């Protein structure tokens, strides 16, 4: 009986360790370790999980300006800090119910659910105000970005991937 209890305890302990290891692996696979935001793999997974968008949804693509210049002139640690600052500003400006991710080096996306032109404008206005406050606070590296957006109600049978591609195109 004691041997059986010891075996059960050992198997339970092993199962808990495996579960924790799996969660850590999933986090590494889907979370940008620098910003804590979902990474490109998670963004791509989101694109594939939504076949056709049924409710008004928007995708906003953001591209940080001058990151290469900051990296080249002030060093990559300052560039990393700039990325982290923008990620925080963006996450704080987009409602918690919506998705924010880091798509690549200096590119971020926001997926806004139950979106309208007004809600998109409100998010972008809030982000601009927060960015101006941050830049006026006295930091020597300024946050600057470009953005483009697309709203599902403007297209028939639209996928999230289609919205992303259109928003990315509208950025330029």
Outline where the language-model segments fall.
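Signal-transducing coiled-coil linker helices
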Residues: 2-33, 41-51
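Inter-domain helical "communication" segments and dimerization helices
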Residues: 3, 17-20, 26, 116-122, ...
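Conserved long alpha-helical elements within nucleotide-processing catalytic cores of c-di-GMP signaling
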Residues: 26, 30, 39-58, 65-95, ...
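Residue-level signal for beta-strand positions within conserved beta-sheet cores that form or flank
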Residues: 55, 96, 139-143
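A structural signal for short, well-ordered beta-strand segments
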Residues: 59, 108, 145-149
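Catalytic core regions of nucleotide second-messenger enzymes
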Residues: 102, 131-148
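PAS-family sensory domains and close relatives that share small-molecule sensor folds
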Residues: 114, 149-151
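S-adenosyl-L-methionine-dependent methyltransferase catalytic core, i.e., the SAM/SAH-binding region
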Residues: 156
């Amino acid at each position: 009986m004691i041997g059986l209890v010891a075996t059960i305890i050992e198997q339970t302990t092993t199962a808990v360790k495996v579960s924790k290891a799996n969660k850590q692996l999933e986090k590494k696979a889907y979370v940008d370790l620098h910003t804590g935001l979902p990474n490109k793999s998670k963004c791509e997974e989101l694109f594939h999980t939504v076949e056709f968008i049924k409710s008004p949804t928007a995708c906003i693509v953001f591209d940080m300006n001058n990151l290469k210049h900051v990296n080249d002139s002030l060093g990559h640690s300052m560039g990393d800090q700039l990325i982290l600052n923008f990620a925080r500003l963006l996450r704080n400006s987009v409602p918690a119910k919506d998705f924010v991710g880091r798509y690549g080096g200096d590119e971020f996306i926001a997926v806004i659910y139950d979106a309208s032109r007004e809600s998109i404008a409100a998010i972008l206005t809030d982000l601009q105000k927060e960015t101006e406050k941050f830049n006026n606070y006295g930091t020597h590296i300024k946050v600057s970005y470009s953005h483009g957006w697309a709203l599902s109600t403007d297209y028939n049978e639209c996928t999230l991937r289609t919205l992303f591609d259109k928003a990315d195109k509208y950025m330029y």
